[in-house]
UniProtKB/Swiss-Prot annotation:
Residues 118-141 are annotated as: Disordered. Residues 1-18 form the signal peptide. It comes from the Bacteria. This is Flagellar L-ring protein. It comes from Pseudomonas paraeruginosa (strain DSM 24068 / PA7). One of its GO terms (biological process) is bacterial-type flagellum-dependent cell motility. It is a lipid-anchor. InterPro entries: Flag_Lring (IPR000527). PROSITE patterns: PROKAR_LIPOPROTEIN (PS51257). GO terms for molecular function: cytoskeletal motor activity.
Length: 231
């Protein structure tokens, strides 16, 4: 019996361990800065002042448009959602059946058991009522800034950018990550772009440490709130 209990506890611990979300880790290779590939040195030509890959028009600005260039994204995200639903379903039914004649003869006759007449009649009635009310609301806000690098330049000139910022505090670490697509026309002269102009944005704000752990429910609470709980 003790062996069966130990095996059961180990199985429950394994299932609950799979419900735990792994904390974010620093130095994710996907969000690492992307550096431009250094071209192989060409043969020296005396008097040459042109270097392939680093040309710039006389009237161009210094906005980012190459792999490895730096862009500052201004975070100004606000989302608000609400939903409310009401339902009320009612149904009443009533059925009444009475037989007064059969093959042309009356169905009413003297009752040999007691007084009164016999009558083959039936009556049925029923009602059902179902009501439901649900309401949900959510609001989020994120402001700040993060500097990222250009990871890829698409054939149509769209810049694929990504990057992360880790801040180490006394009680843990705070993480901000972002990845998405930016038009070169949306970049300001100081190489900044608002987050609302980032297409296909993937923004993550998370952390590790005492504050992050305190805001998470315990493993037993997660079990009761998970789909594994049968009730």
């Amino acid at each position: 019996m003790n062996r069966l209990m130990i095996v059961s506890l180990l199985g429950i611990a394994t299932v609950l361990g799979g419900c735990v979300n792994p904390p974010p880790k620093p130095n994710d290779p996907y969000y690492a800065p992307v550096l431009p590939r250094t071209p192989l040195p060409a043969a020296q030509n005396n008097g040459a002042i042109y270097q392939a890959g680093f040309e710039q028009n006389l009237y161009d600005d210094r906005k980012a448009f190459r792999v490895g260039d730096i862009i500052t994204i201004t975070l100004n995200e606000k989302t608000q959602a609400s939903k409310k639903a009401n339902s009320d379903i009612q149904k009443d039914s009533k059925t009444k059946m009475g037989l007064t004649s059969l093959f042309g003869s009356g169905m009413t006759t003297n009752n040999p058991i007691g007084g009164g007449d016999l009558s083959l009649s039936a009556e049925y009635g029923g009602s059902r009522d179902a009501k439901g009310d649900s309401q949900a609301g959510q609001s989020n806000s994120l402001t700040g800034s993060i500097t990222v690098t250009v990871a890829e330049v698409l054939p149509n000139g769209i810049l694929s950018v990504r990057g992360e910022k880790w801040m180490t505090l006394n009680t843990g670490n705070e993480l901000v990550r972002i990845a998405g697509l930016v038009r070169a026309d949306d970049i300001a002269t100081d190489n900044t772009v608002p987050s609302t102009r980032v297409a296909d944005a993937r923004i993550t704000y998370s952390g590790t440490g005492a504050f992050a752990d305190a805001s998470q429910p315990g493993w037993l609470d997660r079990f009761f709130l998970s789909p594994l709980w049968p009730f």
